[in-house]
A protein has these predicted regions:
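N-terminal small-domain helix-loop-helix segment of the aminotransferase-like
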Residues: 1-85, 92, 267, 335, ...
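Conserved core of the PLP fold type I
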Residues: 46-182, 192-210, 282, 362, ...
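Conserved core segment of the aminotransferase class I/II
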Residues: 206-280
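Conserved PLP-binding active-site segment of the aspartate aminotransferase-like
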Residues: 234, 313-319, 336-374
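Conserved glycine-rich beta-strand-loop-beta hairpin in the small C-terminal domain of fold type I
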Residues: 263, 280-290, 302-315
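Short amphipathic alpha-helices in soluble, non-transmembrane regions
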Residues: 325-330, 368-372
Length: 380
């Protein structure tokens, strides 16, 4: 598989809406400095020794309290495990529970870099349809029967790239179908807490006592991605299998220092207010992007107004290949992520993903204006 180039929003000549990363205004640097100073002032030899493989109580206990309060559903530390973020968690799950040649059910469209993680483990991708928060359960059932998948990978909340959230009925169907078939349900919940109405959905792992659900969370989108701190929520049986991986047993806590820093912020009760600030900033940017899209692409594209997360999924109404158009668009100083990159079969060629996280409202206004002008010229 060809490696996708890592991009940042630091090119002064390009407003790159392909970049799904926070800008500096979304990273609470003062809170991180204060937490770092606190950790430094209270540093002990235990802080920099091998940590518990599942993570230290100083991280897991306040994390459980934060998750319980934010989602209004009880979460206990015993069902949590420290990770280096959702990508590293997904890699761990593949290592622990799959073998080369196994099938993985994935949404179409889905997070394109997850494809590379699955490929690293020699897994076969089997796409199933997702649209406007719904799934075709009959078709999915047939795929499960035919392919006997080891995993089903979903991004239920404010999907990357679609931006939608699965309905309660769709989530219940996924949980039920995976339980009956013995398929592990892997729920990537990186955007779960970025609801613009400040009402976070409960994790999929919190909705069932079934042993087949793993929810993956991260502080990359709600604090800072460079910390590389996240968690897996699952039952004790699955957690023990993950903790039994050789490199976990050998190295102990996956990110001891980072987890203590985040734990300090959680323990001080600061994460809730930091999250609220992030939600408010993102909502303002999403609103401006929606308004600018209406003004500049309203006659040539369709999309849904975002209600959370990082992304807007835009589909051109005329036959056009957004992959082929991208180099021409970038020459004019604006970029996007082509829709086909989010499909294991190359579908969604008329669509594109736009991120409103990496730029302020002025840049978003400027970039969407430029995007609309350029696309109208190219496709007409």
């Amino acid at each position: 598989m060809t490696r996708v180039a890592f991009e940042r929003a630091d090119d002064p000549n390009l407003i790159n809406f392909a970049v799904g990363q926070p800008d500096q205004a979304l990273i609470p640097i003062d809170a991180l400095k204060q937490a770092s100073a606190h950790i430094g002032a209270t540093l002990s030899s235990a802080s920099v020794n091998y940590g518990l493989p599942q993570g230290e109580p100083q991280f897991l206990e306040p994390l459980a309290q934060f998750l319980s309060a934010t989602c209004h559903h009880p979460v206990v530390a015993e069902e949590l495990m420290l990770t280096g973020g959702t990508s590293q968690a997904l890699d761990m799950i593949c290592q622990a529970f799959t073998s080369p040649g196994d099938a993985v059910l994935i949404e179409d469209a889905s997070y394109f870099l997850a494809f590379q993680i699955f490929a690293d483990h020699g897994l076969k991708l089997v796409p199933f349809s997702r649209s406007a928060g719904t799934i075709d359960t009959q078709a999915l059932g047939q795929l499960i029967e035919t392919h006997q998948p080891k995993l089903l990978y979903t991004i239920p909340f404010f999907s990357n790239p679609l931006g939608d959230t699965l309905s309660t009925q769709a989530i219940e169907s996924l949980i039920s179908m995976c339980s009956k078939s013995g398929t592990l349900l892997v729920s990537d919940e990186a955007y779960q807490y970025l609801a613009f109405d400040h009402q976070a959905e409960s994790s999929l792992a919190s909705r069932t006592a079934d042993s087949k659900v793993l929810s993956l969370g991260t502080f990359s989108k709600i604090l800072a991605p460079g910390l590389r701190v996240g968690w897996i929520q699952c039952n004790a049986v699955l957690r023990e299998r993950l903790l039994d991986l050789g490199w976990v047993n050998s190295g102990g806590a996956i990110n001891q220092w980072g987890s203590l820093l985040v734990g300090s912020i959680l323990e001080a009760g600061r994460q809730a207010s930091l999250l609220e600030t992030t939600q408010t900033l993102l909502e303002a940017r999403a609103r401006v992007m929606h308004e600018c899209l209406t003004q500049h692409l309203g006659t040539i594209a369709t999309w849904d107004a975002p209600r959370g997360g990082y992304f807007v999924w835009v589909t051109l109404t005329e036959a056009a290949d957004t992959t082929a158009l991208l180099p021409l668009v970038r020459e004019q100083g604006v970029g996007y992520q082509p829709g086909a990159s989010f499909s294991s079969t190359g579908a969604h060629g008329q669509s594109m993903r736009l991120s409103f996280a990496a730029y302020d409202t002025n840049k978003i206004d400027q970039g969407i204006n430029l995007l609309g002008t350029t696309l109208k010229r190219l496709i007409h």
